Amino acid sequence: ESPEILLAGGGQQSAWEAFASYIPVGFDHILPKGLDHILFVLGLFFLSTHLRPLIWQVTAFTAAHTVTLALGALGWVTVPGSIVEPLIAASIVYVAVENIFLAGLSPWRPLVIFGFGLLHGLGFASVLGEFGLPQDQFIPALIGFNIGVEIGQLTVIAVMFLCVWQALRVMRGQGDPRAAKGLYVALTVIALALCIVPMPAVAALLEAPVPVFLIPLALVFTGCFLSVQFRQVAAPYRRFVAIPASVAIAVIGAYWFVERVFL
């Protein structure tokens, strides 16, 4: 559990203590609690195998949600969760569907991502409003929370990059296909085997059943194996990893949208 954070009491926390104590709060809102934000970030990741499009997207998203997080936390902008949450789900569907039809960064995508970032920032502000901010160290705590969110997002990207790295190396002619296939078979078997191993402590930490995280990873590893196995076809990584992952993300986002609007 996160350490207890003092919300009142005049000077009980220094600026540095407030800043440091809210970093894990922000991180926790992404990993493991922010499944919708995780899927959105993965939607950005699966657009392209190149770093530059990812940097453009993440920069636009970060700038936007930082603005609305601050405005929402200050109480200057308030939008009901009944509006924000369905729109966040819709944003997941949009980026995933665009990944299916576009193989690179379109001129409008950073602007659209910026707009979606404004929505996600309102979602962050809502969570932070429920958690509370110390009145005497409001700004340091807000900055710490936002940095925690950024660290969480970068962690998601880093983990997924490590998952697909060997497949990308083979696609670029830099890796050993046999070693890569062996690695992905082993990782798939391990991920699926761990799904049937009782891990109550891990499930409690994740606040979700362990297979919720491991099965998607196993599917990504399988896609990476196929992209190496059939590396002679056109755009194997996109065909076997990026597009299937984007389809899955779009389906989940669509389900959340329906659930948040109608159920």
Task: Write out the residue ranges for each language-model feature.
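Histidine-/acidic- and/or cysteine-rich, low-complexity loops and terminal segments associated
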Residues: 1-35, 127
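Hydrophobic alpha-helical transmembrane segments in multi-pass membrane proteins
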Residues: 29-262
